[in-house]
Amino acid sequence: KDGYPMDSKGCKISCLISDTFCDTECKMKKAKSGYCYSRGLACWCEGLPENVEVWDKATNKCG
C-alpha cells in the first residue's frame, strides 16, 4: 500500500525537499521507495506492507 508514514506520536514525517531522507525512512518500514511530497511537506511511501500503519485524516492522533 502507499501512504504517509507516521512517527511515534502518530504524526506525518515532515520533510522539506529531501527525497533521500524519505526514501530511507520508508525503506526502514519495508516500503519499496519513498519521496518528499512537496504539497504536504511530508514523506510519502510506496509499496508498504499492509500491516504498516499510515496517517489517515479520519484516525489522526497527531498533536
UniProtKB/Swiss-Prot annotation:
The modification Glycine amide is found at residue 63. It is found in: Secreted. Expressed by the venom gland. Residues 1-63 form the LCN-type CS-alpha/beta domain. Has the structural arrangement of an alpha-helix connected to antiparallel beta-sheets by disulfide bonds (CS-alpha/beta). Belongs to the long (4 C-C) scorpion toxin superfamily. Sodium channel inhibitor family. Beta subfamily. This is Ct-IT2.
